[in-house]
Amino acid sequence: MEQIVKILSAKYVTHNVRQFRLEKPSGYSFIPGQATELSINIDGWQDEKRPFTFTCLNSDDYLEFTIKTYTDHDGVTNQLSKLNAGDEVIIRDVWGAIEYKGEGYFIAGGAGITPFLAILRQLNNDGAIGNNKLFFSNKTDKDIILADELKSMLGQNAHFTITNQKDSIYDQRRINADFLKAEIKDFSKHFYVCGPDAMVEDISGLLAELGADTESVVFER
């Protein structure tokens, strides 16, 4: 079901990632980690649907999306980068397979952090962060989405890796088999993986090879 909602606010949280807060229709609900298809309520764009993950809590009185904008071509995210409070977007039914199953390891690449933002915020709100660990890979330091909030929630368990900046203040290893073997002590825990398709496929395969139960590896299938 399609519903037209107004943008309440829009702000940049990195150089190319924008956080949108929208009106929340009465009765609209989701589980942290889930997504919806969104389009822009402008002629020619209403049917250009793209999936975006909620980054707010279900208990919030607004909907929030944290969206990486690609301005090098005239797609949906480029159009979204031009919108402001008062403009309208179209949201649809909720879907998604990324859902918290229990304590473990979150492995994210770039904008793949978004489903984990909602999950970690909910756990933090419930006082249930526990010993969950995050491995978050980006090209440069300035690409890290909401680094301060992630550090505040997870403390030493927020682990950032940078792949394309030699003077980074963070770990510069890639998340590969050697990294996983060095950093993960217990492959019987839950794993949550989100990022570019190739990364998700690669890491899911590596985790299985290293002894993770495939039923305990959560990603969008």
Summary of predicted features, one role per range:
Residues 72-221:
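FNR/FR-type flavoprotein reductase catalytic core
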